[in-house]
Regions:
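Sec-dependent N-terminal signal peptides
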Residues: 4-13
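Exposed acidic/Ser/Thr-rich ligand/metal-binding surfaces
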Residues: 24-25, 36-37, 45, 56-60, ...
Length: 215
């Protein structure tokens, strides 16, 4: 397993676990909001230096939508040695907001797939097990992966084996790189939402927050 040692991810991707078969039918029929265990995975690489305020705002908005039974953790990353678990699983919004507000930009080549794998491993091993609970990871990035040692096929296999869907909010002040994030989302049943300005960020976050809590 890749050791957590890094920064904050700039495309928000949410990994979402399917509910058990018997409960799935109930949830999908009713559209009921279910409790979720999820991780914020945030790119803190230098290419996002001018976007840090927007990234912090996006992550904070995701946290603010948490219900009383939702738990979350925060991972930031740049390259593989800088994948850092900034906040362990917690139900407390205040602890999550502190982790988000303390994010900072670092130099290095971005390793999206390695960060996703690390976060998925942590989620699957540490999420609370108490009946019908969804699992998710929120990835924030521009989608450019320059340094991962993990293969995308292997990462997708882990996500599918753990019934985790991926939702992405992609942002950049120059260019979005869709290849990796599109595949992660589409092959796990998630979506990619692109945020081009601060004005549309709230809508993107609301779309992800709603979908990660329902079937």
């Amino acid at each position: 397993m890749i050791r957590f040692v890094a920064a904050f991810l700039i495309s928000i991707v949410v990994f979402y676990a399917h509910v058990p078969a018997q409960d799935k039918a109930v949830a999908s029929k009713s559209g009921e909001k279910l409790p979720v265990s999820y991780g914020l995975v945030v790119d803190n690489s230098g290419s996002f230096r001018t976007l840090l305020d927007r990234v912090v705002s996006a992550a904070a908005d995701v946290v603010e939508d948490n219900g009383a039974e939702d738990e979350a953790f925060v991972v930031t990353f740049v390259d593989t040695p800088k994948i850092v678990l900034r906040q362990e699983f917690t139900f407390k919004k205040s602890e999550l907001h502190d982790a988000v507000q303390n994010m900072f930009i670092e130099g290095g080549q971005t390793a999206i797939l390695d960060a996703v794998k690390s976060a998925a491993d942590y989620l699957s091993q540490n999420a609370r097990s108490d009946g019908v609970r969804l699992h998710a990871l929120v990835l924030v990035t521009d989608g450019e992966d320059r340094a991962s040692v993990s293969k995308i096929e292997d990462v997708i296999k882990i996500l599918k084996e753990n019934n985790i869907r991926v939702f992405v909010v992609a942002m950049s002040d120059t260019k979005i790189f869709p290849k990796v994030i599109d595949r992660l989302a589409k092959e796990t049943g998630g979506i990619v939402v692109v945020s081009k300005t601060r004005a549309d960020l709230g809508t993107a976050v609301k779309q992800i927050s709603a979908q990660m809590r329902t079937r």
